Structure formats: C-alpha cells, structure tokens
Amino acid sequence: MTKLTNALIASALLSTAMWAVPVFAADPGSASAGNGESMRDATSGDYKPGRAKPIAPPQLTDEDNRAAPITDEAAAVKSYGIVGRSADGKEIKIEPSEALRDLIIKELNAPANGTEGGPRKTEDPDLGEGEAGRQVFGTDDREQVKNTKTYPFSAIGYLEAKSPKTGSFGSCSATLIGPRTVLTAAHCLYSHEDKDWLSDYLFVPGLNGSTADDAPFGAFTFESAYVLQGFIDNYQGYYGSVLLWDLGIVTLKQDVGTNLGWLGYANYDDLGDFIANLVGYPGDKPMGTMWKASCEVHAENIAPEYFQYDCDTFPGSSGSSVYAYDNKAKQRIITGVNVAESPDANTAVRLNAANVQWINSLYK
C-alpha cells in the first residue's frame, strides 16, 4: 500500500514498541456482545425508508483549511464543554469536569516526543480477509454485510436526523457504545449551515434493506443529543476550523445495547500502525444496506487529535466508528470516528484521552 503523503498538524506521534491492552472502567469503554434477544417488540421510532438523503462528509481541501490545535488553556478547556439538545427542545450546557479540565491542561503542556512503532492491531476476523489500503478513488474494496443480526453488526446502525429549516432528512452511520449511548459525528447532529441543531434523531440498528421490515430490531428515538462545545464555538466559516471537535453522542430513550451489544472504545497513547475497520451505510450502495471496509493506518498519519487512512467511504459513512481488533483484549476497540474526506485521504477524529473522558461523562 502506498503511504499517505498528507502533512499532518505539527504534533507528537506517540507510539512504543508494545501495544498496551486498554484499561477500562467498570462500564464506560468496555465492549459487550449483548444477550442476543430481539428488540423489535420494544421499538419506539417510526422509520420510513427512503426519506433521508445521505449527509455528505465535510471536505478538507488543503492543509491551510485545517486549524491548528488551541494552545490557550481557558479556550481549550471551554471547547470540551458539553452542549446538547433534548428531545423536547431544551438546551443543555455542562461545564467540563475537573478531571477533564486537568487532563486537557496536562495534555496541552505535554512535551512533544515519541517514536514510530510496528504493527499493533489485526484485521477484525469477522470482517474476513481482504486487500486493504486502496484509495477511495481507486478500486472499491468494500463488502456488504449480509447478516446484520449478529454482533458486532447488531451494534452498528443507520442514523436519521431532520433539518428544522427545510424539513428534509439526512442520514449518517453510528455505533452503540453502551446500553443507551450512540457514538457518531457532530456534523450529523448539528448544522453549521443552518446554525442550528438537527432534530428527530432516529437510530436503526442492523438495518439491512430498503423497507421497514428490513430493520430487524426496530428503530429507536432519542432522549438527548450532544456535541463538544468547540464544534460550535470555534467555527470560523470552514470545516477545518472544527475538525478536531467533530464528535457527537446520542442518548436513546431505551436500553438497546443490553440486547444487541456495543463496541468498546479507548485511548491508546501508543497508537501506531494498525488495521482500521469501518462499517456503515454509504449512500452509493443500495438503500439501507450495511458495508464494511478495512485498511492500514500508518503511524506517520496519526496525530494526537486525528488520523488519516485510505478506507473507502461515501456520503452516509459519516459517523462510522473506526475500530481496531485487539488480539490481546479480544475486543473491537473504537479508536476514532470517520468525519471528513479530502482528495488524498479520509479522516477520523481520534479518541484521545480527553475525548474518551468527554464520552465517559455522557455514558449511559
């Protein structure tokens, strides 16, 4: 595979010779395969196939359009505030916790050092063998997931949202990371163009076709949605100014993950070469079908706040989790969220220590 040649933000590439097994809290971050029971009888949402248009990923046209990390402590801490909207339209605003505040300041003042490591993670065995590393503009190496009822695919879903301004619906991809917690991209929840939240978020896990009957577990409505405050406050008229804060959380009204399972997530300080796995709902494929892709991520293309890769994506893939299969932990661990594309690569926001702490504060 030809390594990406994009210049990254001048920052440390933290890696070591050994890949550490993640240390999880009692609940947040750890994976669960679920109990295998169907959720369809408990469905709460009204899914209408065909009404949503895939949300296009933001474009990164050149490095000049990517803002450098904030270096001011107060501004950096403020960017990790929680901004949200409840299903009944109430605004939510929560200041960063003291633990998160201390972590942000610690990372902001950390010295820049590190070495390049060797291969760390393998391709997910359930995705099968496949040639990795093809460019999105080259040969399409994505494969359809035919059985979406089995874990981990039961934990991955189609996410709809409505524009209050136009009344139209858009779609993204999203992943269960807890009983009621869904991880996606912030631009799937909030529109800078409209300067407003989207609404009526609907999560359809394991969707596998173009009819309502193809939603094997039903569809589920949201209780609240959240983004990093920096995604809203730091917008300067172009996407690159908020790339680093393009993370979103949807809290569902019902416990879906106990039955269907959820993926683990973690920060690896020593993140180096690994195989990225993406599963989602690209809009260039038959409506409502789930597709998977795998590709290599090289240490030279990993920054503390994001990383880049060649995995094939398309509008609708925004919000897909980028996960690695950890052989030691025997778990699928989310390391980032697919958020943007450029002529040379696709980009994920990295789940670094601060982002993991932010997600943990919303875990349900």
Label every PLM stretch briefly.
Residues 1-9:
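Bacterial N-terminal signal peptides that target proteins for export
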Residues 20-22:
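N-terminal signal peptide c-region/cleavage motif recognized by signal peptidases
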Residues 25-176:
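Protease-domain processing segments flanking chymotrypsin-fold serine proteases, especially trypsin-like
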Residues 138-154, 160-166, 171, 190, ...:
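Conserved catalytic-core segment of clan PA serine endopeptidases
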Residues 180, 184:
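Cytochrome P450 catalytic-core helices
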Residues 185-188, 335-344:
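Short beta->alpha transition motifs characteristic of CBS
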Residues 241-316, 346-355, 360:
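Chymotrypsin/trypsin-fold serine protease catalytic domain
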Residues 312-338:
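Catalytic nucleophile loop of clan PA
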